[in-house]
Design a protein with these regions (language model features):
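Acidic/aromatic-lined carbohydrate-recognition and catalytic surfaces
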Residues: 1-186
Length: 186
């Protein structure tokens, strides 16, 4: 899987290492690479228990590409602890450091003005809004399972849904941005 590629940022991603691996496969006469599963992982980081069938794992977004796009600085990335061994996934480091960096990239991006973003949202209408809302709620409730959320939102009561959509609109937007970046790089 992508996550098992060597990386200086805690987990394999859509980085130059991925492209180098594809080149290696080609030189070896291989025409296929089993990259699945690509979904966003939850507690325990099992790729077989993703939060969504359609969403991509934000861990796979290449931070160096975000630097090239002017959304992050190399100093910001280097200030993070990514684990001691680039050949082993450092899930704790990835969780605690990657999301704050991705939030900075989101705040600096003008992606809403890109035609590609609007098209991505339109093409992904059948899953993106619900996924982004769910993830915003999950982080709002300290990553607790949905059964531990307040009853009104757990049962998707209209007033609660409307209230949380308004309260968490920036967070919802962040999760949409992550999916846009994932699919741009994928």
């Amino acid at each position: 899987p992508v996550s098992s590629l060597p990386s200086k940022y805690g987990i394999g991603c859509f980085s130059k290492e991925a492209y180098e691996f594809v080149d290696c496969l080609e030189r070896a006469g291989q025409s296929k690479w089993q990259v699945l599963p690509l979904g966003p992982t939850g507690y325990g980081d099992s790729p077989y228990q993703p939060f969504s069938t359609f969403a991509g794992n934000p861990y796979f977004i290449d931070l160096d590409t975000l630097v090239k796009e002017g959304l992050l600085t190399q100093d910001e990335i280097n200030a993070c602890y990514w684990g001691d061994n680039p050949t082993q996934v450092a899930y704790d480091a990835v969780f605690w450091y990657r999301f704050p960096l991705l939030k900075k990239a989101h705040a600096r991006s003008e992606y809403r003005e890109e035609q590609g973003y609007e098209k991505f949202c339109m093409d992904s209408w059948f899953w993106l809004n619900d996924y982004a809302f769910y993830m915003a709620l999950k982080f709002h409730f300290d990553n607790k399972e949905w059964l531990a959320w307040p009853e009104d939102i757990r049962f998707r009561k209209k007033e609660a849904v409307e209230s949380y959509r308004e309260e968490l609109k920036d967070e919802i937007d962040f999760w949409k941005f992550l999916q846009y970046k994932f699919y741009q790089q994928w």
